[in-house]
Amino acid sequence: MGKYSLLLIAFFTCSVYGQVLTGRVLDEKRTPMGNVTVSLLSPKDSSLIVGTITDKDGKFSVKSERSDNLLKITMVGYTPKYINCNQCVELGDISIFPDSKLLSDVVVTGTNFTTKGDKMMIRVPEDVKKNTFDGYATLSAMTIPGLNVDLINHTVTSKTGEVLLCVNGREVEKGEIQALNPKDINRIDFYQKFDPNHPSASAVIDFVMKNRDSGGLVYGNARHHLNIGKGDGMLDVKHYKKNSELNFQISGNYGCYTLDRGEESATSMAFIDKKVIKTSEVKNSIFRSNHLRNRLSWLTQGRGSLFQISAFLNREHDVNDQNISQAYSTMGGEILTRDYTHKDNLSPATQLYYQRKIGKDGLFRTSIYGNYSHTDKFRDYTSTSSFWAKTEEDLFRVSPNMLVGLILGKNRPFFYATYDYKSTRNKYTENEVETKNRLTYGNGLFQIGNNFIFSSKFRVTLRFTENVLSIDNGNSSWTKFYFSPSLLCSADLGHGNTFRGELYTYVNDPQLAYYNGSSQQMDQYQILRGNPDLKNGHCMGGEAIFDSNHKWGMFELLTQYINMPKYIYEDVFVDNDKGMFVHTYRNGKSYNHFLFNTEIRFNVIPKKLIWMVGGEYNFFKERDKRLSALVGGTDLTYLGKNIIGKVELLSPFRYLAKGVEYKNPFSLKLTLKYTLKDLQIGFNATNPFMNNSSVETNYTADNYSNVAKTYNPRITSNMFMLTLSYRISYGKKHNFQNIEMGESQSSGLLDQQNIRNEKMESGKK
């Protein structure tokens, strides 16, 4: 009956320019199908004109401004259907049927999760779209084992390394994910190991978006702490015209508050003629800050090509006025110390980006990013002895890159190249004594490889990488080459089970600041100095991941081992002639880290309540230090009527990094958000009513030791925050997203206030 209806419509419906093509998509059982892709193509070359997806009732509407239309209906696991709908407006019911050959490559493991090749395709349910308001909240609500989504700092991390965030296959910055409308998400692709469009990435999250029925989009977000003068906000405006997009985004944060507690430490320093024990407590520290970030970009898209130009300006202003109570074993009484710092930064940047399809679904992509950064920092330290210091830095950065990826039968060869050039000139003045320093840094990466598709259930990716590293500090220079191969495999074991493994090598390259050889005074007895002679370690590692996906939930086992020779660690030694202890960085013995992690996700109440629980064992060996640590965590996610709530618990955990032992406290995070159409009101809390939560560090060297506890009340503990988001849209249908710019700000300065603030090492590919 549906076929005859379609023929009658084709014969008797008149062509109307600017009309809307409508229809309904059904499966082989004549059940309406949601999330089916409907594309309007040009009959001449089959190029995409516009597209959409069906709603939960299988209905769709596509606006057409021409009389000859070619409609393509596609759904994973189904045979694509093409319809010549000349002079058609109402298409009626359209049935599509399963493709037995295609289904052999797809493993359906649950209602919302499908595994195909190297990726997991995640269908976002309508209840999640309805109750979340941005990309981060949507990803968090899906509760995917192996992914950690931080809704406060807007970050996504995994145990296997950094997670690259994309929209429709294009790398984007976090502001774009924050402004993303969950209602426009077609699906989310999770590449745990290999993405052909980003072959050097450890893991990729790609938001596949549908077209919007709007000529513009305005998104605003504001957050403010309830018990401290601190907050941030963002305004994102997009305007579309034909095949182009103009985007303006402004974001920033502010702070004006006083902390009554900070770092509390005890330091022991043994000189040749005396031993000094110093105790220190930071009290009543005043913080003032305002950061402003502006971005303007223009994007145009042609047949299979895309070009974008972006401009960026960042301004930062920070004031930290610390009042410290100190005591020394060599003198009696309490000493009141003031440590005042004032920092300003200006950083403009620009980027050109171009990509084009080549061959059959191949890709050519190139971009160049440039950045200039100027930093002024002033410090006034008043104690038993006083000093003032001023630092000025000018940093230039250029970073081009290129990717060529092809599809040749069952092979996906690729070539990727990038180079990061940085040049810093800085001047450090202390008590009118001036020291100048310059440093030029280059890091090139050239990678070639292939993704071998042996069958629908087994793939292997081989990558060969050549790293070129160069350093020039004005007095000496060197250039070194490192060859780093890697081997990945993915296997479908059936019944919802998959295995992914990797053996890899990489170069452990320290940050630019560690090479800075200038000296900075920390206090009466301590100096911080970089090391221009640091070496690079040729590291290796391996990891294996087993996933088991079912309708009741998901289960993941992960194990990882990394070995880093010539590991960079903090070294402290005494200079008895000057009566000072010098903090610097050196290469030491190897660093070894082994972890075993497991996480289980339960659909406690389908579409309502999700519970995930996990545990991890870590073993660290760094030079002569060894550390074993267990950590456990759990989170509970609730989705209700326009409400999403989440509770996250993490037990205390310890780790080693650069010679320092860290102990992070118990962590509790609460999230509650209510959505009403285009408005969302939210509440976040971190470690509520826990005023004594602190990060502990412990460092010991010859003749020196330091034990410290760092408190951050009302920011990382006893923190309460209110959020408000609003979104409006208008006009015609378009679908473009921003390309990610490089780091908006770089610096080659060692900051003594950030010492002992290292993260746990993870594998890098």
Regions found by a protein language model. Name each.
Residues 30, 57-59, 79-81, 88, ...:
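Membrane-proximal, glycine/serine-rich, low-complexity loop/turn segments characteristic
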Residues 397-399, 439, 445-447, 529-531, ...:
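Outer membrane beta-barrel strand-and-loop segments of large Gram-negative receptors
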Residues 235, 259-275, 319-335, 350, ...:
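Outer-membrane beta-barrel translocator domains and adjoining extracellular loop/strand segments
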Residues 22-34:
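Structural motif
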Residues 200-222, 321-325, 367-373, 378, ...:
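Surface-exposed extracellular loop regions of Gram-negative outer-membrane beta-barrel proteins
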Residues 342-347, 351, 378, 382-461, ...:
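Outer-membrane beta-barrel transmembrane domain signature of Gram-negative proteins
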Residues 41-47, 70-83:
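A short, solvent-exposed loop/turn motif at the edges and junctions
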Residues 44-59:
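Short, acidic Ser/Thr/Gly-rich low-complexity loop/linker segments typical of extracellular
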